[in-house]
């Protein structure tokens, strides 16, 4: 019941006080709380309990940028301005390459820096995808052997297979216009969507329709704006799959 939920939420503070320490609670993919039944009521309860705690800090992270922004930067949501909002940068290619090569070596397998770099480029350095693709490549390499382009190609195919059910789910309800818009981005159009040539080539309808498409695809977290007026696909592997 209601009291039990509050007791559970108060637990970290009680433990921290009794042990005389400070606790940091980390919650990943926090935006999924938005899918709970009666989510706003639950968010209000969380906030009301958490904001009274002085021995516990909360680190809430999520991969869906638009949903996280909405929860913490929209005045209509309980967690509005609840804490500091940080955008995490991707891990650098140099660090990834070093890490991938090291992990291969430590298990008696080998991969060239060049191939490790290709893993970073295919995945656009998205941590979960780098791990997944490197793992598929690693699986295919025999002990004491060196990874090849062939292994990488195999790894990419396995990664696409693994992601396919999710990608089908993400795209099956999209309109023809929305799919056309995504294909425009995948084909290298990142700005100037309302130019006549682009509207016609990709069958995007009217300039007003483009504004609606942008908004709807951002809400679905399928596209992102990393720089002013520059649109990109949010998910590099979804882009590869749609190709």
Name each region found by the language model:
Residues 37, 46, 71-72, 100, ...:
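Short, flexible helix/strand-to-coil boundary loops that buttress conserved ligand/catalytic motifs
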Residues 17, 161, 165-243:
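C-terminal leucine-rich, beta-strand-based interaction scaffolds used for sensing/assembly
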Residues 1-64, 73:
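Conserved Walker B catalytic segment
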């Amino acid at each position: 019941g209601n009291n039990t939920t509050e007791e559970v939420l108060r637990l970290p503070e009680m433990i921290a006080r009794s042990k005389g320490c400070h606790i940091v609670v980390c919650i990943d993919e926090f935006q999924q709380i938005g899918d709970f039944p009666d989510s706003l009521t639950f968010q209000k309860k969380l906030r009301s309990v958490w904001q009274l705690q002085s021995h516990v800090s909360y680190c809430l992270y999520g991969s869906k940028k638009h949903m996280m922004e909405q929860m913490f930067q929209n005045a209509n949501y309980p967690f509005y301005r609840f804490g500091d909002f940080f955008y995490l940068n991707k891990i650098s290619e140099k660090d990834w390459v070093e890490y991938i090569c090291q992990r291969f070596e430590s298990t008696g397998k080998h991969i060239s820096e060049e191939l490790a770099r290709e893993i970073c480029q295919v995945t656009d350095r998205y941590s979960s995808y780098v791990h997944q693709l490197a793992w598929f490549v690693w699986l295919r390499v025999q002990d004491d052997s060196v990874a090849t382009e062939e292994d990488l190609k195999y790894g990419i195919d396995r990664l696409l297979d693994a992601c396919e059910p999710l990608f089908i789910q993400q795209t099956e309800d999209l309109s023809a216009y929305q799919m056309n818009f995504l294909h425009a981005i995948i084909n290298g159009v990142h700005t100037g969507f309302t130019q006549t040539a682009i509207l016609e080539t990709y069958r995007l309808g009217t300039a007003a329709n483009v504004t609606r498409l942008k908004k709807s695809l951002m809400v679905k977290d399928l596209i992102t704006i990393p720089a002013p007026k520059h649109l990109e696909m949010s998910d590099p592997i979804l882009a590869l799959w749609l190709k």
